[in-house]
Structure formats: C-alpha cells, structure tokens
Swiss-Prot record:
Region (CPSF4-binding): 175-210
Domain note: The dsRNA-binding region is required for suppression of RNA silencing.
Region of interest: RNA-binding and homodimerization: 1-73
UniProt-annotated stretches for the region PABPN1-binding: 218-225
Entries under HAMAP family matching the protein: INFV_NS1
Protein name: Non-structural protein 1
Length: 225
C-alpha cells in the first residue's frame, strides 16, 4: 500500500476529529455540519477499503499534524496568493476572429472552438490563467495561433457554468490539439501551459509524441513489417 495513501487517510481522520470537536461546541454553521456528515461517510468507506481502523488512524494523524505544527512559523500559515500568468497580450486576448469551417464542442464548463479549414500549419497554444500551489486554478482564455498570428482555435470558460478543474482544462487541450492535428497541423504548447496546465509527460519527464506523429510512426512501423 502506498505510504502517502495511508498518511493522507490518517491526517484526514484527525482533521475530521478536530472539526467534530468544533461542531460539538455548537460553533459550526449548517454547511459546515453538512460537510462534516458527508466526510464521515467518506472516511468510513476509505477505512473499509484500506483495511484501517479510524480511531488508530486518528491518533497517527494527530502525531503527523503535531510534528508539522512544531516546525511551522506564523509566516508559513498565510494562505498563498494566486499568481496570474500570461502568454497572450491584451490585444491577442481581445481580438475578434472568424472561422471558415467552424467546429465547436462543450466539455463540462469549457467551450472548445476550432477552424477546421486550417491545414498544414504550425500552431502554438497560448493561455492566460491563474495558478495556486503550482497548479492551474482558473483558466481565463486559451487560444491557438498560427505562425502568422492568426487565431484558429480557442478554449474559454462558459459564463453560465462556472468552475473547472485542472483536469478539465487538460482534457480540453487534448481535444483541441487532436482536432487541429487531424488536418496535419503541427501543434506546439507554450512552456507555461506545459508546466501548469498540461503536464502530459512520460516517465522520463519528456512530452510524448503528439497523436499525428504517433500515427506517422505507426504507419512507418506497419510498412516495415
């Protein structure tokens, strides 16, 4: 069993115990109490799956938390602020663009648009988004540009469906790349997106071959066989 899985469960059990003590003093509001009940059911399920006793795990979690607090300074207790990262200029973000052969897909709370008329181009993906804990927090806008600067694709949050995860954004990027590569375009992803929003790397930390290169390699292998 992964030690991180065990220690995470232990800490969650102890933190639930602290929240329960807080609620016992009639200090919690309705949403707090509702989350407490839901998390209790979740912990029981995780305990059964892991084969761990909740009371024993709570004691172990207390030791972990106490050890962390002993090493913690008041400065470290501050909530980290979000950072806003920008690949695009204000002009690139606000520029209107048009599609000759429009294709649009909604994935969760994200809208993916691309121009299917674009072929045999080198395309770069750029994005503006906020980051917290070194992970994407909120996507503001992602756009696909040709080397000439024309906009040929876009991923944007839907105002009517707020809220998206880093995994949602990564999946949307995969859809956009797949659609653009279908017409033999070469798609590159900015370093900022690779680092925070699209951590699609193999075991050696290298970005994998894009789908069109994989298809070309497969055809080459088949012809050799």
């Amino acid at each position: 069993m992964d030690p991180n899985t065990v220690s995470s469960f232990q800490v969650d059990c102890f933190l639930w115990h602290v929240r329960k003590r807080f609620a016992d003093q009639e200090l919690g509001d309705a949403p707090f109490l509702d989350r407490l009940r839901r998390d209790q059911k979740s912990l029981r399920g995780r305990g059964n799956t892991l084969g761990l006793d909740i009371e024993t795990a709570t004691r172990a979690g207390k030791q972990i938390v106490e050890r962390i607090l002993e090493e913690e300074s008041d400065e470290a207790l501050k909530m980290p602020a979000s950072r806003y990262l920008t690949d695009m200029t204000l002009e690139e973000m606000s520029r209107d663009w048009f599609m000759l052969m429009p294709k649009q897909k909604v994935a969760g709370s994200l809208c993916i648009k691309m121009d299917q008329a674009i072929m045999d181009k080198t395309i770069i993906l750029k994005a503006n988004f906020s980051v917290i804990f070194d992970r994407l927090e909120t996507l503001i806008l992602l756009r696909a540009f040709t080397e000439e600067g024309a906009i040929v694709g876009e991923i944007s949050p839907l105002p009517s469906l707020p809220g998206h995860t880093g995994e949602d954004v990564k999946n949307a990027i995969d859809v956009l790349i797949g659609g653009l590569e279908w017409n033999d375009n070469t798609v590159r992803v900015s370093e900022t997106i690779q680092r925070f929003a699209w951590r699609n790397s193999d075991e050696d930390g290298r970005l994998p071959l894009p789908p069109n290169q994989k298809r070309k390699m497969a055809r080459t292998i088949e012809s050799e066989v």
